Regions:
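Small beta-barrel nucleic-acid-binding modules, primarily SNase/OB-fold domains
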Residues: 2-146
């Protein structure tokens, strides 16, 4: 990746590729909250970072773990299978990097893998593509995976 020039990085970013700098923090999954939200920590010692996966929406669970939407537990279980505790992940943000709840908004990748976890949720049938303007970067991949 270091051999790619600045224009190449811009072109890759525009094409929907994850462009994560070499000095980006390394993250690991602490736990899965629901089908589209995880908690991560990083190698800088920060813990409890709440991450909302962009461009995908799954059934919601309330704070007690009770169902608010059909298949909420199944969506959470599926994401837990994809991202068990301790899994190394890479995060890629878009135009707005946090939401009104203070969650980091990101595309999530297994470390060293180019498969977008956000799209894998839709591909598995546990979520649907959702466009949250102005964040559009991951929407085409998630929509295509439905």
């Amino acid at each position: 990746m270091k051999a790619v020039g600045a224009l190449g990085l811009v072109a890759l970013a525009g094409a929907g590729w994850a462009v994560i700098s070499d000095d980006a923090p390394e993250y690991s999954v602490e736990r899965v909250v629901d089908g589209d939200t995880i908690i991560v920590g990083n190698d800088a010692g920060e813990t409890g970072i709440r991450v909302r996966l962009l461009s995908v929406d799954t059934p919601e669970m309330d704070g007690t773990g009770e169902l608010e939407g059909c298949y909420a537990h199944e969506a959470k279980d599926y994401l837990t299978e994809l991202l068990p505790t301790g899994t190394a992940v890479e995060l890629d943000t878009d135009v707005e990097d946090t939401d009104r709840y203070g969650r980091l908004l990101a595309g999530v990748y297994l470390a060293g893998d180019d498969a977008l976890i956000n799209a894998e949720i839709a591909r598995g049938g546990y979520g649907v593509a959702a466009l949250y303007q102005p964040n559009e970067k991951f929407y085409p991949q998630v929509k295509a995976a439905e």
